[in-house]
Amino acid sequence: MTVNFLTRISPAGLSHTLKNSWPIKFQGLWALGFTARFSTEFGLHPRRNYSFHVQEKSRETKLLHHLRARISATGPVTVAEYMKEVLTNPMSGYYMHRDVIGSSGDVITSPEISHTFGELIAKWFLNEWTKVGKPKPLYVVELGPGRGTLSDDMLRVFSQFSDSREVVSLHLVEVSPHLSQLQELKLCGTVSVVKDVLEAEDRHRHLHLHTSPESEENFYKHNITKHGVPVSWYRHLEDVPHGFSCFIAHEFFDALPVHKFQKTHEGWREILIDIDDNVGPHHLRYVLSRGPTPASKFFVDPKETRSSVEVSPESGVLVQDIAIRLEQEGGCGLVVDYGHDGSKGDTFRAFRRHALHDPLCEPGTADLTADVDFSYLKKLVQGRALTYGPIPQGMFLENMSIKARLEKLLKSATPELQKQLKSGYEMLVSSDKMGDRLKFLALFPTDMQEVLTKTPPAGFVAPP
């Protein structure tokens, strides 16, 4: 499903231009999406020409003041720079000081819908770990752990088996001080007295100046979970200790910054974000670079046939780092996210209170996201890692016997709990809900080719 990123009307006749950019003019708004990352169609008809006479612009936020000052000083920012500021600005970023997940937040994720989801992820990791002889120690690494629900459900399964319980440790990559506290409460029941994430950035720089890359003391927080498993928090993946690792990135890559490019008769141009002091509904607007930018020259494939493209260099760096670790230390990884195979170009959007929201409206108050280009990730790890998928979430979970797990739980459940279990199952696997919209991609070191040829990864093939 393609989502038009041009989510506001730009009235004809805008006169404000910059030396390196043109205002984008277009005729209408047509945004499709889904509640909690999926919803119903809304907005204006794409073919009609609407004229807006806005009496009042949208509310100004603290982050908007910061963005306006930055743009006034240095010029329009890229969409990638905008996303990074909106989501992770230390003072006013969306993720930094609030609970954004669940019914009280802006999005709902699979682990929050059913504990079975995390249990099956743990089962998958245990299966792949067993295939290669159960190497020790075993690091479970989650990127962007949300509330900690997925990790908590996985550890409950790991702790049931002595082989894994005695060797496993949990490593969480999290930049948000608030979310790291929620994760610690969920996993450990207490919050340790430690430096916050912002102070950890200074610690990160110091450690990389004065310690070896192999140092295992780069965490900014450490505790013991309710299951007796050591858990540590890190601001960067590079701080996580090296070893045989099971990587899980659930709805993580879709929040990483993307550059947006548009094909014109003069070649590729980058979409930028500028101040709008005119009659637009918000204080910011999209503009088009007048010429090629360094990003458009470097990131757009000369053979690209789409008219618009989104590229996330940060995603590329991270997936390559994971591939290198798998190649050097062994392990496996799962990327679970909304995404496509390189066929889409306009997916940048925002969510607030479980509904689509204009990305330029009141920055810092809504979640920003862009679908993951799985073909881009696979291309970047080619030769370093084996990849399987992406396949739909519903297919993966059915192959992992989620229905059998559901039937077992229903036998001992009350009527009310049975209703909840069935509803959660439908939400996770149904094609018109999350079943087709979320995708699973697996990564393995290339030296596992022979093993995986004989015994393909669980979940990616139908069980016998």
Per-segment meaning from a language model:
Residues S180, L256-P257, S343:
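Conserved protein kinase catalytic core
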Residues T2-L143, R147-H236, V240-F244, I402-A404, ...:
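Rossmann-like AdoMet
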Residues F117, F247, D337:
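Conserved RecA-like P-loop NTPase ATPase core
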Residues G291-P464:
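Long, Lys/Arg- and hydrophobic-enriched amphipathic alpha-helices
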Residues C246-V300, F348-P359:
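A mobile, often basic/glycine-rich helix-loop segment
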Residues P145, H250-F252, V336-G339:
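Short, well-ordered beta-to-alpha junction loops that form the rim of enzyme active sites
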Residues V229-H265, V309-P313, V317, R325-E327, ...:
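A short SAM/SAH-binding and catalytic strip from SAM-dependent methyltransferases
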Residues N89, M96-H97, S103, T109-S110, ...:
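Generic structural "secondary-structure junction" signal
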